Amino acid sequence: MNLNLLKYYIKENHDTVSTLALALDIHYITLTLKLNGKREFNKHEIEIISKRYNFDAALTMKIFF
């Protein structure tokens, strides 16, 4: 998992942990734990993030797997 690359895309898209957490319908602390590698993203969250930032399949794989 390449969390630094995901953090880059969050900033590049002028998003914050709070706004992304709202889009994922999770608490911002839960998202922070996921961004720090303490918890894993589930399939639904990966789909939402990939659509939100227009990731292609290769980039999704690079970031999350």
Regions found by a protein language model. Give the residues of each.
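Helix-turn-helix DNA-binding elements, focusing on the entry/boundary residues of the two helices
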Residues: 17, 28, 46
